[in-house]
Amino acid sequence: MKLNTNEEIIRKANSILRMAGSRSPERICHYLGIHLYETPLKRQKGVYKVIEKRRCIFIKNDLDPVMRNIVLWHEIGHDQLHRKEATQFREFNLFDMTTNRMEYEANLFAAQIGLDEDQLWDYIMQGRDDVSIARVLNSDGNLVALKVSTMSRAEYNLRIPEHRNDFLK
């Protein structure tokens, strides 16, 4: 497995945003030629798989709209970053970044695609915390914390909020 740097992941996500012209995960899937299937998954929220050269995302059919978008961005991240590894179904906790580098990379990709930096910066400057920012941006506090962490490392001087990796368990 090739490890991607944070900079490579952010660059890839930004390139897709520019080319697709949208943050909509459905539009991005369409633009990239990824087939999307809603299915009654039991334990997983989403799965990325290549089947006979057909790139597929299987997503749990009863997710709320916010979680659905996050899961789709995450699975699109696997398509863009880990396509070669998508040869078998694997079960991972979406936000378990401590045990699996691929999951961390897909989460970072999702944070970059899903959260506009300018909007996020405006809310940070208003003094909001990661949970209230997530609520206002229809996202998740863990995704906001991850994005703030990457912004802090890149060019901003921010206090990095703590986040739980296992909140979906």
What residue spans do the PLM features occupy?
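Active-site hotspot residues in diverse enzymes, especially metal/ion-binding acidic/histidine motifs
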Residues: 1-169
